[in-house]
């Protein structure tokens, strides 16, 4: 049955007001939650405005969700993210990984592009996400769907690794056969 997503997720906007020493994370479209993604110091030394993301909660940057930068936090007991991020909890009736796959789907990415607002960058407010429809079968069926999608994702990941290895092999064989094209150790004629 189709339901309104907002009936199954709830905003969580708790700030690190006590300036606890909590790891700072970003959310990327390829790796999900990443510590020190940009390889530099956090823009602000004052992290009291940063939002806490407990284990199992979702977070996304409203101006990056259009490329799939959304994930649920499964790294630490709690982490913090930029104050710009939206953070939300999920109802026990909605399997987190099922929601994750839904939010990364082409259907949702197209819908985000259609409803997001902004002059320079598209921006998706949490209130807009609440209005998205989601097919919500029973929990057991959600878990079965997740198992299938997890297996497919694993196969895709392994195939991508194989392609990378084959690409490396082709490059190394080329170098063995013809040498470095810059140094031209075999004195190939150049036209």
Q: Predicted regions span which residues?
A:
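Non-catalytic DNA-recognition/assembly elements of restriction-modification systems
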Residues: 1-16, 133-146, 158, 162-191
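Sequence-specific dsDNA recognition surfaces
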Residues: 6-55, 191
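A short beta-sheet element
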Residues: 51, 55-106
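A short glycine-rich beta-alpha junction/loop motif
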Residues: 63, 78-84, 117-140
């Amino acid at each position: 049955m189709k339901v309104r997503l907002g009936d199954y997720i709830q905003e969580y906007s708790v700030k690190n007001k006590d300036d606890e020493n909590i790891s700072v994370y970003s959310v990327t479209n390829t790796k999900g939650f990443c510590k020190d993604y940009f390889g530099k110091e956090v823009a602000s030394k004052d992290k009291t405005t940063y939002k806490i993301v407990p284990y199992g909660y979702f977070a996304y940057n409203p101006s990056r969700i259009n490329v799939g930068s959304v994930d649920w936090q499964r790294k630490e007991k709690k982490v913090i993210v930029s104050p710009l991020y939206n953070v939300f909890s999920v109802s026990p009736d909605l399997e987190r990984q099922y929601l994750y796959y839904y939010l990364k789907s082409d259907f949702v990415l197209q819908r985000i592009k259609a409803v997001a607002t902004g002059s320079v960058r598209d921006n998706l407010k949490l209130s807009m996400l609440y209005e998205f429809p989601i097919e919500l079968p029973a929990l057991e069926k959600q878990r079965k769907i997740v198992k299938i999608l997890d297996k497919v994702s694993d196969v895709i990941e392994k195939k991508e690794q194989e392609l990378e290895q084959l690409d490396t092999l082709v490059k190394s064989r080329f170098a063995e056969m013809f040498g470095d094209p810059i140094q031209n150790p075999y004195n190939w004629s150049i036209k």
